[in-house]
A protein has these predicted regions:
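Stable alpha-helical elements in mature extracytoplasmic
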Residues: 16, 42, 56-63, 85-88, ...
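Bilobed periplasmic-binding protein-like "clamshell/Venus-flytrap" ligand-binding domains
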Residues: 28-29, 69-79
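Short helix-initiation/N-cap motifs at beta->coil->alpha
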Residues: 57-61, 143-158
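A conserved catalytic-core signature of glycosyltransferases
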Residues: 34-36, 41, 152
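Hinge/lid segment of periplasmic solute-binding proteins
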Residues: 1-37, 52, 61, 87-88, ...
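Aromatic-glycine-rich donor-binding/catalytic loop that engages nucleotide-sugar donors
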Residues: 43-55, 138-141
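Glycine-centered hinge/linker elements that transmit conformational signals in sensory
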Residues: 66, 107-145
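Alpha-to-beta junction loops
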Residues: 70-74, 159-164
Length: 164
């Protein structure tokens, strides 16, 4: 179904809509006005081990550590897919990307008229990658996690080997 001529597509700025156009100009997906991120938790494991459900980053890290102490993986995701890595980085870089410098970088990066290749800068990205490095340490992610696909994660979750 081509949505390119619909009222819904007409309500989307071309800057955003262009990212969803196929080579023939058709549009099969529209960007939404919100993007939600969160974690699925195995509440039974939290209750069984009397570990409080996380409400912020600090309590998330504490929960990961508490589960590690009882031999259960606190957190992982389907990092086999590049979009999971990118979504994680996006979530961890929200404060940098919404800063003045971050908005400036995003504007230049996404400008279709910009013919100069825009890479990662040294203002916005160092802190984002430092935060990503800390997240990797806090959650115990390893090289093996890069091979975890959706089915692997679901199986760990269902078998009680994964809390989040």
């Amino acid at each position: 179904m081509d949505l390119s001529t619909t009222n819904a597509a007409g309500a989307v700025y071309d800057t955003y809509l262009n990212n969803f156009k196929n080579q023939d100009g058709s549009v099969n997906w529209l960007p939404v006005c919100a993007d939600a991120h969160g974690f699925v938790v195995n509440k039974d494991l939290f209750e069984k081990y009397d570990i409080p459900l996380p409400t912020d980053y600090e309590s998330f890290v504490s929960a990961c550590q508490a589960f590690d102490e009882v031999g259960i993986r606190g957190f992982t995701a389907d990092y086999y897919y590049d979009y999971t890595c990118m979504e994680t980085l996006q979530g961890l870089s929200a404060s940098e990307l919404s800063s003045g410098d971050g908005r400036k970088w995003r504007t230049i990066y996404s400008d279709p008229d910009n013919t100069k290749r825009e890479g990662l800068d040294s203002t916005v990205w160092p802190e984002a990658f430092e935060r990503m490095e800390q997240f990797i340490q806090d959650t115990g992610l390893s090289q093996d996690d890069l091979d975890m696909n959706y089915d692997d994660v679901v199986e760990m979750y269902k078998s009680g080997k994964l809390a989040m």
